[in-house]
């Protein structure tokens, strides 16, 4: 569990570091399917061997099959997960312009059940919030994020999602306030449940919000605090390197990229080097949903 959480945190931090200047990044909910490790291989194989019409027909048959199972066993999680995956696959076949709220709604239904049946797995609730946000139900999305944060105030996925939602509503101060409150309570929360709030991760997220608002001095200060808190953690080093690079301070940025690569586990070194070579991303409007690397297993 710790390794899975850490990998997700690293991926998010790298994404935030690269995209800090456009706010919190967005991948529509169909991207959650497209990045599901357990389904990538099967999907590639299916797409390579079946024409689109045949593939759609096969997926529709799967949906009907899972629905029949759920009529008999409404809380059968294997069927719920299968139904969710099949519907996401059908959704992924559509162009973005073709996706209608009704297409997202059929994904929301199994997600609501899975979130209720697995309150300890915030991934389902985050996906649910993301889906609701995409159909314009911002209040429903906010409620889903708040429900997670009420029991897991340090959940980075929920924090990232809530921050993205607030920024999409032109409420950066509310996003900053949420993160600052999380940090102010981190010591107490971690005393009760050690490790439940990743303080450095929250600081990096806070810095990215400041950076998205072009408050570079504040962002740099937060990153420095994170680096001071844990000098061996490469995440704030990467984030500050991207901040410097965005401001045209390439020489200083290179030093930090090199430091981050030296600190990072082997599996992340190439990603950091690639981030160091990528051209700075210009400012643009913040989109309304969080990135998500994979659906829950």
Language model region names:
Residues 82, 127, 161, 205, ...:
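Canonical tetratricopeptide repeat
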Residues 2-23, 32-39, 190-193, 197-200, ...:
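Terminal, low-structured helical/coil segments at or just beyond the last alpha-helical repeat
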Residues 1-102:
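N-terminal leader/linker segments that initiate helical-solenoid repeat arrays
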Residues 69, 113-114, 147-148, 181-182, ...:
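Canonical positions in the second alpha-helix
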């Amino acid at each position: 569990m710790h390794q899975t959480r850490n990998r997700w945190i690293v991926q998010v931090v790298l994404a935030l570091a690269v995209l800090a200047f456009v706010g919190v990044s967005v991948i529509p909910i169909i991207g959650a399917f497209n990045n599901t490790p357990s389904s990538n291989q099967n999907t590639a194989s299916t797409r390579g061997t079946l024409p689109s019409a045949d593939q759609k027909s096969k997926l529709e048959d799967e949906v009907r099959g899972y629905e029949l199972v759920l009529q008999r066993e409404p809380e059968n999680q294997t069927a719920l997960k299968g139904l969710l995956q099949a519907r996401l696959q059908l959704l992924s076949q559509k162009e973005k312009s073709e996706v209608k709220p009704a297409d997202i709604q059929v994904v929301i239904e199994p997600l609501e059940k899975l979130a209720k049946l697995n309150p300890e797995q915030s991934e389902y609730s985050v996906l649910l919030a993301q889906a609701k946000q995409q159909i314009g139900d911002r209040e429903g999305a906010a409620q889903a994020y708040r429900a997670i944060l009420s029991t897991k105030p340090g959940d980075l996925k929920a924090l990232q999602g809530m921050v993205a939602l607030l920024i999409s509503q032109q409420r950066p101060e509310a996003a900053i306030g949420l993160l600052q409150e999380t940090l102010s309570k981190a010591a107490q929360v971690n005393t009760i449940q050690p490790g439940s709030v990743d303080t450095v991760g929250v600081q990096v997220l806070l810095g990215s919000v400041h950076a998205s608002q072009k408050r570079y001095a504040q962002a740099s200060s937060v990153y420095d605090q994170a680096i001071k808190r844990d000098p061996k953690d490469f995440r704030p080093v990467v984030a500050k390197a991207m901040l410097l690079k965005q401001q045209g301070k390439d020489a200083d940025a290179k030093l930090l990229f090199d430091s981050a690569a030296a600190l990072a586990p082997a599996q992340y070194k190439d990603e950091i080097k690639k981030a160091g070579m990528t051209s700075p991303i210009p400012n643009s409007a913040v989109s309304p949903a969080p990135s998500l690397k994979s659906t829950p297993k």
